[in-house]
Amino acid sequence: MKKIIFILLLFLANPIVKGQIADRFTCMTTIGTGISMNTPSTTPFAWQVTGHYKLSERFSAGIGTGLSVYEKALIPLFADARFQLTKPRRVVPYLQCGIGYAFAPDEDANGGFFFHPSAGVQYKMHGKTTLLLSIGYEIQNLERLKKYESSHYAAEFREKLHHNLISIKLGVML
């Protein structure tokens, strides 16, 4: 009988423990640009939406997508992890890392590997709204089809690009 009561208490305690972390799901959107670290130099524009699930008070993981524009438009799909360096308060520094693959909707391009570690700070505003500012390093691989035509000949080749850049992003988390 004692074993049955103990097992029932364990099952009843589980919802109590999970109830201690408020708002387990968060959604964030960011826009950003970067400083290219290689040639050919391209200043990208990036917009991302990420959904996170809080695994603890300071660590969350989720998935994201968005739109990145380099020479061609890319749609990244990535896994994302985020760790807050201090306990939750008005201003909190954090580390974040996204890794995945970017797809190219254009038939003249192929996407590639995507990796984006960053460090940032979040500032809690009214209610659940939080502002985000981050600086990171982004790696984006891309393959595009280049065509050249003149009156004498026509050429077509695939060019593999490896973008490495320092990224700056501003966003909102709800």
For each feature predicted by the language model, list its residue ranges:
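Bacterial Sec-dependent N-terminal signal peptides
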Residues: 1-25, 170, 174
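Outer-membrane beta-barrel pore domains and translocons
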Residues: 30-36, 66-68, 84, 98-102, ...
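Gram-negative (and chloroplast) outer-membrane scaffold detector with strong preference
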Residues: 41, 45-131
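Outer-membrane beta-barrel "beta-signal"
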Residues: 81, 160-174
